[in-house]
């Protein structure tokens, strides 16, 4: 049987352990590539070699987004200017939506769901590497990640206070 005293009992709420994530809707043209994004290639030659394969993947992603009717995962960005954001995670999603808007005339994909984080250049680069941690990668991409993360951890240990030294 329900107790009437439970209805009026004041609950003590536990403090939120995690910050609230707020989705901001940002036009795809306001989202700029992160210079640390290595999956498109780092040199002109590498970009040329990867261009066709990346385009195929982004068209397939555009098809999936269209089938879902929305981008189902927020992009992670940081503000770099008054009305400009740098993508930390979500480059392919942005490019897939660009295909939907510019080539398939579907304006409803012009605004992308984004979480805005206040990150230093070092943390932004590190997060760019770590956010690609679970995707299938070539040996080259794995090497870029490991070298980049290792360099950041050695060069800027103060940016990673939660990691044990050594």
Regions found by a protein language model. Give the residues of each.
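Short, charged/polar connector segments at secondary-structure boundaries
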Residues: 1-113
């Amino acid at each position: 049987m329900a107790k009437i005293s439970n209805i009026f009992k004041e609950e003590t709420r536990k403090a939120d352990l995690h910050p609230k994530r707020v989705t901001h809707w940002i036009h795809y043209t306001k989202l700029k590539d992160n210079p640390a994004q290595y999956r498109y290639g780092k040199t002109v030659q590498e970009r040329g070699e990867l261009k066709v394969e990346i385009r195929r993947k982004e068209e397939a992603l555009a098809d999936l987004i269209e089938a879902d009717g929305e981008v189902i995962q927020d992009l992670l960005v940081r503000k770099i200017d008054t009305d400009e954001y740098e993508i930390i995670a979500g480059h392919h999603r942005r490019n897939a939506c660009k295909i939907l808007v510019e080539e398939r005339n579907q304006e409803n994909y012009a605004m992308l769901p984004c979480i805005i984080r206040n990150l230093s250049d070092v943390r932004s680069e590190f997060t760019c590497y770590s956010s690609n941690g679970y995707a299938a990668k070539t040996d080259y991409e794995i090497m870029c990640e490991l070298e980049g993360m290792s360099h950041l951890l050695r060069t800027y240990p103060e940016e990673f206070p939660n990691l044990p030294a050594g």
